[in-house]
């Protein structure tokens, strides 16, 4: 069984604060409406969360590019490579259970940071995950693969 730890968590701030600003947080709580307190909470659209592995930033840094964590729009940043997981795989993080819904393959905005960045991390951009059991995640929580599809 693959396991690791949560290195950092991010949330997109709501309109009343700094709309669209990505903020590093120590914990997040989720329910059926999404990440409590985020801009997209209760917006009636399906918003999967983005999980990014340290592997993505390692690839970027090996190419001598250096960016702050959070650039890849991750909600959850972990130390374990989970990019082998397919749609339908199940991951436990903190109190929560997630289903992998697919690979995150949106690279368009990354061209603004470095033209080579999208090609560099192709296939290693992140995973879309959807909560199926709700609760809380904190930095340092364990990440465990429960089932591989």
Where is each model-derived feature located?
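A structural micro-motif recognizing beta-strand termini
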Residues: 79-81, 130-134
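Short, well-ordered loop/turn sites that connect or cap secondary structure elements
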Residues: 85, 91-92, 136-138, 143
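A short, acidic, flexible beta-alpha connecting loop/helix-capping segment that sits on the rim
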Residues: 133-136, 148-149
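Active-site scaffold segments
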Residues: 97-102, 119-131
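Short, electropositive, low-hydrophobicity segments enriched in small/polar residues
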Residues: 38-41, 130, 139
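Electropositive, beta-rich accessory/interaction domains or terminal extensions
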Residues: 1-103, 148
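Short, basic/aromatic beta-hairpin or loop at an interaction surface
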Residues: 63-75, 111-126
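Short, surface-exposed beta-strand-loop junctions and turns on beta-sheet-rich folds
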Residues: 106-107
